[in-house]
Amino acid sequence: MSDSQEIPYHNQLKNRFRGYFPVIIDVETAGFDAKKDALLELAAITLKMDENGYLHPDQKCHFHIEPFEGANINPESLKFNGIDIHNPLRGAVSELDAITGLFQMIRRGQKDADCQRSIIVAHNAAFDQSFVMAAAERTGVKRNPFHPFGMFDTASLAGLMFGQTVLVKACLAAKIPFDGKQAHSALYDTERTAELFCYMVNHLKDLGGFPHISQIDETENTAENQTAL
């Protein structure tokens, strides 16, 4: 008997989000236009589910990125995120290397979890998704694992659960420590967003909100039918 057969249906990651593999993303940029402004930093964290159905952060990657040729650089954006694009200690790589490394990590995790496609999880997710997709298009990297427009927005989810939409306030509501001095570092924000998303998913489970009673009945009926066959 395989591991997936031994673990209850709703305690398998592939069955939690309809076959989607959730990946936490955060980007730091030189503006708001994903087509024209530079992508300067990117971090991602994949998730795993334990045998009891609880979600946890798993693998991570982090890249400082060189502005693509002809990219706009908004000085106000650099002042906001504190990035010095001319600092050689950044260790910046090309967009091609960053997106290639990101997709390789995600495809491995997606395969291991037996999921069919990946989905971006981010705080104000439309922003992060637009920059990742624009970079993927510019670089021509094949086999983009992400759904082209679907996403999970932790700002919306936190607004529903806590009445808070700002990342730091949502984290504090979930009793997740947040160091404001490290905010707007892509890796730090991704780590906190991953903790927040896992907390919300796990808390819903603890409250009895997932699986829903209708899903439990449906799963049991499916299992009975398979046994009968």
UniProtKB/Swiss-Prot annotation:
Binding site for Mg(2+) 2: 26, 28, 184, 189
Annotated catalytic residues: 184
Binding sites annotated in the UniProt record for Mg(2+) 1: 26
SMART domains attached to this UniProt entry: EXOIII
Organism taxonomic ancestry: Bacteria, Pseudomonadati, Pseudomonadota, Gammaproteobacteria, Pasteurellales
Cited function: Trims short 3' overhangs of a variety of RNA species, leaving a one or two nucleotide 3' overhang. Responsible for the end-turnover of tRNA: specifically removes the terminal AMP residue from uncharged tRNA (tRNA-C-C-A). Also appears to be involved in tRNA biosynthesis.
GO BP: DNA replication proofreading; tRNA processing
GO CC aspect terms: cytosol
Cofactor: how and how many bound: Binds two Mg(2+) per subunit. The active form of the enzyme binds two Mg(2+) ions in its active site. The first Mg(2+) forms only one salt bridge with the protein.
EC number, as in UniProt: 3.1.13.-
Chain ranges of the Exonuclease domain: 23-197
Site feature Important for substrate binding and specificity, where: 32, 80, 127, 149
Family annotation (NCBIfam families): RNaseT (TIGR01298)
Residues in coiled coil: none
Name the UniProt record assigns to this protein: Ribonuclease T
EC class of the enzyme, as a word: hydrolase
Family indicated by similarity: Belongs to the RNase T family.
Signal peptide: none
Keywords of the record: Exonuclease, Hydrolase, Magnesium, Metal-binding, Nuclease, tRNA processing
GO function terms (MF aspect): 3'-5' exonuclease activity; magnesium ion binding; nucleic acid binding; RNA exonuclease activity, producing 5'-phosphomonoesters
Cofactor(s) demanded: Mg(2+)
Subunit: Homodimer.
